[in-house]
Each structure stands twice: as structure tokens, then as C-alpha cells.
Curated annotation (Swiss-Prot):
GO terms for cellular component: cytosol. This is UPF0149 protein XOO1028. Pfam families: UPF0149. InterPro entries: YgfB-like (IPR011978), YgfB-like_sf (IPR036255). Signal peptide: none annotated. NCBIfam families: PRK04758.1. Belongs to the UPF0149 family. It comes from Xanthomonas oryzae pv. oryzae (strain MAFF 311018).
């Protein structure tokens, strides 16, 4: 299942008077789900820690974002994608969006996990690396082609790290529960 268009997510976000970008919303949602948070229609209220937050319109871009993200994270073919910015955006905008995504992921993960979950050694490293990325900024990159390649590699690392954490906190326990 494909993620909705970034612009559609941004537009619906503005209609709900949210100050978060599409990247931040997707990062928070992915963190929430990876930390074991429930897949529910009120996900925005949960990741924003705002019980007064209105749920996204059923079938709207934000609802599609939740549904597609859940499907991608559970896909055995590793079809998970990051929702950042529009294709063709400048390097600085893509870099900022990725680091914003990582910051929001950590927030959502912390809200869902509430306390330190039992992670594999690789999961611990992935979480620490995501925390380091969350502290970075686009100032660490310039417009060189090497930086464009480096950003693509970092995006791929983030994608794999998220799936690893989701595996540690959600898929692993679910599998162990089936065995018992």
C-alpha cells in the first residue's frame, strides 16, 4: 500500500491546525507503532499527547497515512518508506525533513514504549543512531553530489533501523505470543 502524497498530508494537517510537517507526523506515527502503540483512528492525539486532538477524517490523507504505514511496517517484503518532502525538493529541505522525521520518531517511540523496552543489541544501536541523527542539521551537508548520495544512504539506514525496532518491540513479542 502506497503512502499518500506529501501535499495531501500537509493540506489535511493545516485543516486540523497542526503545526507538524508531513515528515514529523509520519515519523511520530512510525515511532508510536514501532514502540508498540496501538493502530487506532485517534493516533494523532496519541503521538501529539493531546487528548483534545480531533481524529483525522476517515478516508482522508492522514487516515490513509496511518493505514499505509501499518501495512508497510508489517510487510514481509520490507516495502516500508519514509514520507519526507516532495520529490525534487532541495537537498537542505530533504535533509531537514529527515532529521525532523527522526526527532518525531523518537517522541512517538517514547510515548508508546513509556519505559525502556527490551531491545536486541542491534535495536539498542539503531535507537542510539536515530537519536544522533535527530540532533543533526542540514548545516552538516552542502550541495555536493556526494551529500545527495550520503543522504540517500542515511534514509535507507533509518528505514532499516525503524523496521528493526518494530521487529524488536512488536513483531518479536507477537511471534513469541503465538508460540505460547
Amino acid at each position: 500500500m502506497d503512502l499518500p502524497d506529501v501535499t495531501a498530508v500537509q493540506n489535511e494537517s493545516r485543516q486540523l491546525a497542526l503545526a507538524s510537517s508531513a515528515a514529523e507526523l509520519h515519523g511520530g506515527l512510525c515511532g508510536w507503532l514501532s514502540g508498540g502503540g496501538a493502530d487506532s483512528a485517534d493516533w494523532l492525539a496519541r503521538i501529539l499527547a493531546d487528548t483534545g486532538q480531533v481524529a483525522p477524517k476517515q478516508g482522508g490523507a492522514l487516515d490513509q497515512l496511518r493505514q499505509a504505514t501499518v501495512a508497510q511496517m508489517e510487510d514481509r517484503d520490507f516495502a516500508f518508506e519514509l514520507l519526507l518532502v516532495e520529490d525534487g525538493a532541495p537537498l537542505a529541505a530533504r535533509t531537514d525533513a529527515l532529521f525532523d522525521w527522526c526527532r518525531a520518531f523518537l517522541g512517538g517511540f517514547g510515548l508508546a514504549a513509556q519505559q525502556r523496552p527490551a531491545l536486541s543489541e542491534e535495536g539498542e544501536e539503531a535507537l542510539q543512531d536515530l537519536a544522533r541523527l535527530a540532533q543533526a542539521s542540514s548545516d552538516d551537508f552542502d550541495a555536493a553530489d556526494e551529500d545527495d548520495t550520503a543522504l540517500a544512504e542515511i534514509e535507507e539506514f533509518v528505514r532499516v533501523a525503524v523496521l528493526l525496532l518494530h521487529g524488536d518491540c512488536v513483531m518479536g513479542p507477537r511471534f513469541r505470543q503465538r508460540l505460547n
